[in-house]
Amino acid sequence: MSFRAARLSMRNRRNDTLDSTRTLYSSASRSTDLSYSESDLVNFIQANFKKRECVFFTKDSKATENVCKCGYAQSQHMEGTQINQSEKWNYKKHTKEFPTDAFGDIQFETLGKKGKYIRLSCDTDAEILYELLTQHWHLKTPNLVISVTGGAKNFALKPRMRKIFSRLIYIAQSKGAWILTGGTHYGLMKYIGEVVRDNTISRSSEENIVAIGIAAWGMVSNRDTLIRNCDAEGYFLAQYLMDDFTRDPLYILDNNHTHLLLVDNGCHGHPTVEAKLRNQLEKYISERTIQDSNYGGKIPIVCFAQGGGKETLKAINTSIKNKIPCVVVEGSGQIADVIASLVEVEDALTSSAVKEKLVRFLPRTVSRLPEEETESWIKWLKEILECSHLLTVIKMEEAGDEIVSNAISYALYKAFSTSEQDKDNWNGQLKLLLEWNQLDLANDEIFTNDRRWESADLQEVMFTALIKDRPKFVRLFLENGLNLRKFLTHDVLTELFSNHFSTLVYRNLQIAKNSYNDALLTFVWKLVANFRRGFRKEDRNGRDEMDIELHDVSPITRHPLQALFIWAILQNKKELSKVIWEQTRGCTLAALGASKLLKTLAKVKNDINAAGESEELANEYETRAVELFTECYSSDEDLAEQLLVYSCEAWGGSNCLELAVEATDQHFIAQPGVQNFLSKQWYGEISRDTKNWKIILCLFIIPLVGCGFVSFRKKPVDKHKKLLWYYVAFFTSPFVVFSWNVVFYIAFLLLFAYVLLMDFHSVPHPPELVLYSLVFVLFCDEVRQWYVNGVNYFTDLWNVMDTLGLFYFIAGIVFRLHSSNKSSLYSGRVIFCLDYIIFTLRLIHIFTVSRNLGPKIIMLQRMLIDVFFFLFLFAVWMVAFGVARQGILRQNEQRWRWIFRSVIYEPYLAMFGQVPSDVDGTTYDFAHCTFTGNESKPLCVELDEHNLPRFPEWITIPLVCIYMLSTNILLVNLLVAMFGYTVGTVQENNDQVWKFQRYFLVQEYCSRLNIPFPFIVFAYFYMVVKKCFKCCCKEKNMESSVCCFKNEDNETLAWEGVMKENYLVKINTKANDTSEEMRHRFRQLDTKLNDLKGLLKEIANKIK
């Protein structure tokens, strides 16, 4: 089957699944979207399903009362029943079929649970029964059927057996399987029902289990309550009482089964009547052909046997004859242990050997059996063991989480691979093992040296492995010849992103794109939206707009591996994404891109656990990027540095450094290789061995540059222009430009201070005019940065400070120009003074490059955030105290200025130790207040009839004490603790934080024009003129993308691929060494434990 056909087939199956409605009762919910009305369903059942009634009374000679051999008394027979005295009773001759009178919903009165039930003849056609289950009771077509048998009587559930049953139910739930049991509240069936109930309670209703019980109608206790009333119309609800205290030999029905099929052959008290119909139903299901089955177009069915006696033996025998594989639990006792022990016999199987095993495991049962029946048992066992390839044995003592799953999958695989029509169907066998995630079997049985696999043969199963998140199978297919690049066509990627991509992830991606306005996020969102082109979204105005499509699909067609990697990363497919990452080109860039995407998405996820998983995976990819780059750098520094600046359109045109910074991957930026690269950029052509003081000295004594005082990384090519080359290389170095800017900025601040303090006149003097020209140069530089960075310019706090400083300076000039007005001139000077503070604080940013001062500056920045939190808490305390104090002391103060002083200013000063003096009546000074409110004094406190302060001191003084205690001790110490935590956090990663912040300064000066201040202004004029000339001539830049097409890029990526393989080998070797070390430690512990046991025995013997 071609991949396109497989994909269309998967799409059809998905649509069929959406169109069908699953109806479950008891632990399953009933569907409300029925294709038939209740009356149609009743008509269908009455037309196709029958009950059986005995119409010939044959007296049972062994019975004491007048009872027929069918088990019913003569009075319980219908009117007109004939008397039969000579013939042997047979249900086919002596019973007659009538329309069934027992079907509908069954409600268990004890627990109030519901289920579906029907009474049907033992001769009912299996096809009609299957139609009832799937089309009328709306059960989804099973992906697997598990027929559980054994342990109907005297069954005691062991803890390990309960674990096996729990795993069996989990498999049924996860695989969409049907479980077939005896359906009674007795023995094995009772415990199966309880496990079904426990698993149903712990999971959502959409994942409920289908547990079908098939029991004999004549063995059901209280079955009269299941018969419909004569006047009942439509569907019937039967009220069934579970009477556990009844000593009746009959069984009660189990309340945890979802569907009950009650098989009737006209008898009462005759067990095993249902066996024939159950076998027919199992055979019909196993032979039914369905589309898209991973079992050769059939529904897989497996018999699960434990314990049991004769009926279990017959059930296993029938299953084996019908080519149904069987899983037997060794250690569960009785017939299961007999079969398990005989499977291990290597010699030819003799009757005596079989009988020996029967006597060993079933001594009482075999001793009571007639010889003929014993021979029948031996015959059945031999028939079973002739098809030993259909038997799979698991040991109850070794019951683990995967033992049941492995056993069922292995049983199905053996049955499938040994069948005549499917033994050469390698693709079908591989699908089966993929469905059950059996990698070892696939490795050992299918991918052998006997067969050569083509890439096209593995494409269908590869797609299944991707959507089922089977990373080990994906790796296996890649190792066996699958070409991932050829497999990832546009149709495949469209199918993955449109039908196997979480809508929630898509919404989170869209939220992140809108929130952070990030280039990579926008690119990835457009890429995903291009595949999900049928998706529509509604904008804020309520209008519909189509998804944005990528106009250039080349990033997708040229980089399908990166698109698949992004698909896996966005959905947090941890192990699968790692397998795909190993196949991509530009692994370092891909790892950093994954880290950035995951960290950004984690910020917008509402689920804390999901956000934590994304953060954890992001950190893993950062670690991979660090380790891989370290491997590359240790091999070749120059090529490793080329990797840092390599960009790819599949990641929005970003390079490794940009993605690492945007993802805040400080560990990567702090790597020696990255820092050495930044240092090369920082010093330019100047050798890094040159001392900084030499470079700074050359700024003041320029001729030293050409005298060999400063060393350079390389020698000039043209000897005649050697001196010119030295000067150009020196003054274009970012470090020299930075140093010159520092000198210039300090000179600018000194000039600014001189003008403010000594030379500020009504008419500007030359120093002030020089100051204006220097600020103009700063203004031009900020305009250039804004033009280059766009909106991102204002994301940097220092840029905001620069803009604010320039804005204040312009405002100061505006006031300064009105020199005729003294007040305006003074206002201008005040604004200049405030602006000087901003420009001076801006000096802090320059020294972030210092290894010693840089971390301290970062601490200051983070402590400012702590101060804002502190001020919020302090404001609550301050306003509460200030309003209460003012209201207690004074009445109807109308002056806002004094209200502000009393409510805000004075409580604020109290935090610094200035205790309010107006809360103590004994020391209150009326000379410093006013009663009229007209003077520049605070309002006096309210007086009583004796002209004494009215306020109660027993309130005001304790109030001040509590306020001082809360602010000066509690809040201030809280702030100190916050500062301590912040400093400690930065101190722990002192080196990383500084190196990360250093990157921004290096990039800032590397992106600037390499011309010292203030001469750079001429370059700005030249750039403006050039831009205007281009606009007038309407020149267009038609350069096309050359991503990954340059020879140097291909060589670098090929070399990185080799380094990646070395890195992966080291990881695997390290993991193997760790495992070996653990095994060695366990062996040492085992030896020590044995020595201790021996020592304890010696001590015990001495005591005796």
UniProtKB/Swiss-Prot annotation:
How does the annotation summarize its subunit structure?
A: Homotetramer. Isoform 2 and isoform 3 interact with the C-terminus of isoform 1 in a thermosensitive manner with decreased interaction at 21 degrees Celsius compared to 37 degrees Celsius. Interacts (via N-terminus and C-terminus domains) with TCAF1; the interaction stimulates TRPM8 channel activity. Interacts (via N-terminus and C-terminus domains) with TCAF2 isoform 2; the interaction inhibits TRPM8 channel activity.
Recorded protein name is: Transient receptor potential cation channel subfamily M member 8
Q: What is the effect of changing H946N?
A: No effect on glycosylation or channel activity
Chief subcellular site? Answer: membrane
Organism for this UniProt entry: Homo sapiens (Human)
Positions the record marks as coiled coil are 1071-1104
Q: Carries keyword Ribosomal protein?
A: no
- Catalytic reaction annotation: Ca(2+)(in) = Ca(2+)(out); Na(+)(in) = Na(+)(out); K(+)(in) = K(+)(out)
Cytoplasmic topological segments: 1-733, 790-796, 849-853, 984-1104
Q: What does this protein do?
A: Non-selective ion channel permeable to monovalent and divalent cations, including Na(+), K(+), and Ca(2+), with higher permeability for Ca(2+). Activated by multiple factors, such as temperature, voltage, pressure, and changes in osmolality. Activated by cool temperatures (<23-28 degrees Celsius) and by chemical ligands evoking a sensation of coolness, such as menthol and icilin therefore plays a central role in the detection of environmental cold temperatures.
Q: Which GO terms describe its cellular component?
A: endoplasmic reticulum membrane; external side of plasma membrane; plasma membrane; plasma membrane raft
- Known regulation of activity: Activated by cold temperatures and by both natural and synthetic cooling compounds such as menthol and icilin. Activation of the channel requires the presence of PI(4,5)P2. PI(4,5)P2 regulates the activation and desensitization of TRPM8 channels. Activated by intracellular Ca(2+).
Effect ascribed to mutating Y745A: Abolishes ion channel activity to cold stimulis
